[in-house]
Amino acid sequence: MSQAGSGHAAGASYRGEFPVAFGRYLLLKRLSRGGMGEIFLAKVGEIQGFEKFVIIKKILPQLAANDDFITRFIDEAQVAIKLNHVNIAQVFEVGRVDGEYFLAIEYVDGRDVRRLLRRCRESGTRLPVDLCLLIARDLAAGLAYAHRRTVAKGQALALVHCDISPPNVMVSYEGEVKIIDFGIARSALRTADSNPNIGFGKFGYMAPEQ
């Protein structure tokens, strides 16, 4: 896990002052904020023309002192960083900057399915059948890969994404379908305790396997 100093004033990113240096990344804007963390659009690369856009998923500083939460965050990273499939947004790095843990994730230039469905409702139309079939096919391919993926000594990840819901499925402007956010998932490699009687995800989209 990489560690670095950010070189920016403490709390600057939370005041909406962008761009903001964060380790070797430059945060361009905040995309969302929840009770556990924030999502930023960022770029990496110092040479003009060789910059790359990424997504930075950063947990809130006050949660860094919660050992159980950090263990689960690292579990997520250890699982997600092993996945390399065309239909899964790739995790490039897990690290810590000035005590703030983060993931650097592939940026998908497109729209999530929730936004596509909302646009269809507003316009009184439906998603084309061929697009629905494409999304379903590619989702199945990505999930099957994650479930059968093996690591050292042939151990299977046996990974189940517990929240395959419209916000967690991206469709790029080039027609690629990508699964994002394996943060709510069950894997054979997780070390943090989990209660088998507790289900994770959105009720209408919970994985039946859990």
In which residue ranges do the predicted regions lie?
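Conserved ATP-binding/catalytic core of the eukaryotic-like protein kinase fold
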Residues: 2-210
